[in-house]
Design a protein with these regions (language model features):
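A general "mature secreted/periplasmic domain" signal
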Residues: 62-80, 95-97
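Beta-strand cores of secreted/periplasmic/IMS beta-sandwich domains, seen most often
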Residues: 45-63, 83-92, 96
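N-terminal edge beta-strand
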Residues: 26-54
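Extracellular/periplasmic metallocenter environments
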Residues: 27-33, 78-122
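Bacterial N-terminal signal peptides that target proteins for export
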Residues: 1-11
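Bacterial N-terminal signal peptides
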Residues: 10-20
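Short beta-turn/strand-loop junction motif enriched in small, turn-promoting residues
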Residues: 54, 74, 103-105
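N-terminal post-signal-peptidase region of extra-cytosolic proteins
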Residues: 37-46, 69-72, 81-85
Length: 122
């Protein structure tokens, strides 16, 4: 019986160590993004993170707009003179775009040009 208990205890310790190491690989990233004339500078248009990373996008703009992170379904209003945070944990892998949304007079919205593409790797 003590041998079985010891084996189960060792298995539990290995599982805890694995979970700790898996969690340790996630990181936190902050990106300051400025929209001017409807565009983000070329060198800031691609963001790469790993799955489970905590991501914070700090948005500033020269004109008010609504922005939407597709795939994560996060929408924020951004306005001149303020920094607006968009936070998420990168659970889903793939390529996700952030686009401005503009209201249509007939209802709904239309999309502007892609501001940023976020690539989430496993």
């Amino acid at each position: 019986m003590p041998r079985m208990w010891c084996s189960r205890f060792s298995l539990a310790l290995c599982l805890i160590a694995f979970l700790e190491l898996a969690g340790a690989s996630a990181a936190e990233f902050t990106f300051a993004l400025r929209v001017e004339n409807g565009h983000v500078p070329e060198n800031m248009r691609l963001i790469r993170v790993k799955q489970n990373d905590a991501v914070r996008l700090e948005w500033s703009t020269d004109r008010p707009m609504t922005i939407h992170l597709h795939g994560y379904d996060i929408e924020k209003q951004i306005a001149p003179g303020a920094v607006t945070e968009m936070r998420f944990t990168a659970h889903a892998t793939g390529r996700f775009t952030v686009e401005p949304h503009f209201p249509k007079s007939s209802g709904g919205h239309e999309h502007g040009d892609v501001l940023v593409t976020i690539e989430v790797y496993p």
